[in-house]
């Protein structure tokens, strides 16, 4: 039985926190200006109409409205925000 820890066990023993990425507002949901729509690494989803892109590729709404996920091409997705129609 060892009376000292091995060198590996003292250097291990940490785990990084989850990054909490993903879609935060889905298609059809209403958003206010500045609301985060997608948190991502890289551009899996591209910004469309009335959507801004942060330095960490986060997509956010530039106006109040309704979220709509669309296809730019067959392989590229984009998200847009359209003004809510008054009913």
From Swiss-Prot:
Polar residues: compositionally biased ranges: 7-19
One biological process term in Gene Ontology: translation
GO cellular component: cytosolic large ribosomal subunit
Keyword Hydrolase belongs to the record: no
Region (Disordered): 1-23
Keywords: Ribonucleoprotein, Ribosomal protein
Single Gene Ontology MF annotation: structural constituent of ribosome
InterPro entries given in the database record: Ribosomal_bL27 (IPR001684), Ribosomal_bL27_CS (IPR018261)
Pfam families registered for this protein in UniProt: Ribosomal_L27
UniProt record similarity statement: Belongs to the bacterial ribosomal protein bL27 family.
Designated name of the protein: Large ribosomal subunit protein bL27
Provenance organism: Synechocystis sp. (strain ATCC 27184 / PCC 6803 / Kazusa)
Gene name in the database record: rpmA
